[in-house]
């Protein structure tokens, strides 16, 4: 039996990226649980505690199954079998976690904290989560479309054969410029994702600056 041709979706790289994203998301939640005592607002502390409790419950009951699932995906990749559905499940889960963490981070930015260490650490942990998540989304959707003779993204350079690095590069640039640079969306779906990604980053920067000004003025 001949091995399957190499997929442009590169399942091995995709799996490594998504596992890294889930790792940072888990560290974010664990750090949130350790710092709940620093949240001075009672309602905000209750919300944070609820999500942390949901996280610990999920980890306690589903972590063994998730580990087995990831090992199964690795085995399929090693055998050269098609496992894109498994990669997509991990990607969708990371997307859900990314948006939940985004909501929690906004909660921290808008709440009164007894110390600033928790907020700073959570901001740092969120950056790789959102970058890896949106980089994977851009890569998965555009490459899937190109395999069907279409495209969702037009790159300024080397548009015929973009590499995985190109997608994560435009996701990283969004951290600094609030919109993907060096590429443009050619479909409503991708344009919507570009806008959502940019708005999320702009929201965090605006709230962070507002919080910094408030602290500097003694508010």
Where are the predicted features?
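Alpha-helical transmembrane segments of multi-pass membrane proteins
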Residues: 18-37, 206
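Cytosolic-side membrane-entry/anchor segment at the start of a transmembrane helix
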Residues: 54-111
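Hydrophobic alpha-helical transmembrane segments of multi-pass membrane proteins
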Residues: 58-61, 89, 93, 120-128, ...
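Membrane-proximal soluble regions of multi-pass membrane proteins
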Residues: 140-184
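Pore domain of cation channels
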Residues: 166-170, 180-219
């Amino acid at each position: 039996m001949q091995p399957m041709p190499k997929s442009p979706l590169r399942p091995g790289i995709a799996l490594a990226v998504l596992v890294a994203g889930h790792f940072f998301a888990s560290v974010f939640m664990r750090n949130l649980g350790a710092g709940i005592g620093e949240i001075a607002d009672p309602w905000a502390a209750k919300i944070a505690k609820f999500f942390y409790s949901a996280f610990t419950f999920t980890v306690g009951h589903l972590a063994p199954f998730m580990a087995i699932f990831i090992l199964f995906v690795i085995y399929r990749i090693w055998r050269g079998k098609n496992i894109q559905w498994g990669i997509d499940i991990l990607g969708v889960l990371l997307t859900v976690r990314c948006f939940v963490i985004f909501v929690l981070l906004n909660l921290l930015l808008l709440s009164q904290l007894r110390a600033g260490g928790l907020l700073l650490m959570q901001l740092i942990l969120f950056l790789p989560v959102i970058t890896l998540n949106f980089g994977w989304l851009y890569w998965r959707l555009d490459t899937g479309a190109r395999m069907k003779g279409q495209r969702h993204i037009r790159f300024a350079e080397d548009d015929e054969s973009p590499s995985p690095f190109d997608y994560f590069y435009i996701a990283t640039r969004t951290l600094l410029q609030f919109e993907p640079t060096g590429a443009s969306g050619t479909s409503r779906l991708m344009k919507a994702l570009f806008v959502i990604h940019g708005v999320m980053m702009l929201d965090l920067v605006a709230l962070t600056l507002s919080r910094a000004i408030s602290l500097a003025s003694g508010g």
